[in-house]
Amino acid sequence: MIGQLGTLLMTFREVFPRDATFQWFVVAVLGFIVRLDHHGVSSSIRWLRIRPSTYETFLAFFRSSALKFDTILRHWQTLVSQRCTTRTSSGSIVLIGDGLKVAKEAACMPGVKRLHQESENSGKAPWIVGHHFGIVGMLVGNKEKAFCIPLAAELHEGAVALRQLQQKQPPTVVGVEKITVVTLMGNLLKTVAKQLAEPCVAVLDAYFAVGPTFLIAKTLCGREGQRLLHIITRAKDNVVAYEARPVAYSGRGRPRKYGRKIRLETLFSRAEDFAPMQVCIYGELKTVSVLCLDLLWRPIQENLRFVLVKDGTATFILMCSDLTMAPEEIIKLYATRFKIEVTFKMLKHIIGGLRYHFWTTAWRDPKGKSLAVDQLSDMLDRSKRLIADAMNAIEAFVGIAMIATGLLQMLALEHAEKIRSLHRWWMRTYSSEIPSEEMVKTVIQHEFYHNFRRFKHTAIYRIIQAKRRQQAPELMEMAA
């Protein structure tokens, strides 16, 4: 599997102007996969057996201006879309977006702030101090198994001043700059869809069922004026929509602007309006009752497709901006949203992609407080640069960890039979014929620690061995 991994990594060579930067990128990706503990950059140095004297150089790689991570992500997004994407019946790529919060109590780490977590999981504290990332992934797979390959991530909470330091453009809603968690997610989806240059459907949870999400997606159009980004999201419980305005009008006063107001939650009591439908939800074929309505939604002044679903005693409402999509497909696509939660688990616990420790003494804000925009005017240029470099390093670390996770998922889909033949360790159950990311990681680790010399003719072997060789001054120091 190291040979196949090396082939995929070598496709990134063209986006690095310097060979040294590319080599450290390979070290970073392979380090995430083969290391046996999650202690930041030092884990990769230790388990790859790279010279300890290169530790500072490895750290500098993440902060380096030579690391053009936007270019790397664009190549990564194109690579994934060309190899293993899942498409809708109309040929659209399926994107999934969500937020991920990680506890970080470092006093000198940029972007750390007090965050609220809503979860029924008793292991999650209601309040933490840390980072909130917005992450967008692409649904890939086949009939056997599906993955959500992460494509892009950036800090989404407490990021107003930091985005200025990083020289990132703020999102706009109807021509007005507006930076919130919702608009940043909408802007990230728009950026990814624009790079893919193909029709996309983004699946989001109810937190993003607000006007700015749909308004930002609406602005991305192709050369012929067709929309390139549609949104599917779960509606809030109190959602209200309107019927079409009556064409005929007679009487006194101003003509009505909207039709009859409908509180959609009340429609669940009208059982006779619902029709039975078979849909695939979480891998199981189920019969649910569905009511599909195209109604006007005031926040965007346009029609949306509302799909009301009764699954036994459970009820929920889905919203879709694509009025041509069938209700069963809308339900099926929303059911795949949980795949990004599985990716978060792999990114956090298997890859250790959030175990970074980048900080700077230029960040002196009280713990849990965001950097305000008005503070930038009194800040030294050197402090601004140090904070921006630290933030870029954090996002680069998470981004490279995402690429490592995605590469494992791609290998699982493309080389499933070979991986299962190489995996000789006992497992109580196999979820499908397609191996998990952890199984692929175990196979690569075994090859690396026991049979790495078999790959001595590959570029990945030469890069790692070059980082292991001791230079003359180091040999003299050991001799002394």
Give the ranges of each region predicted by the language model.
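Structural motif
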Residues: 16-24, 123-129, 386-398
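Contiguous, well-ordered alpha-helical segments that form the cores/surfaces of helical PPI scaffolds
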Residues: 26-32, 137, 401, 405
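Gly/serine-rich nucleotide phosphate-binding loop at the start of the catalytic core
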Residues: 1-63, 69
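Active-site-proximal, Lys/Arg-enriched surface segment
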Residues: 64-159
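Glycine/proline-rich, flexible active-site/cofactor-binding loop segments
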Residues: 40, 47-53, 139-143, 152-158, ...
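Short alpha-helix boundary/capping elements
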Residues: 33-38, 49-52, 66, 104, ...
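Generic alpha-helix structural propensity
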Residues: 24, 36-40, 53-57, 67, ...
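Single, function-defining residue in the core of a domain
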Residues: 1-13, 108, 147-480
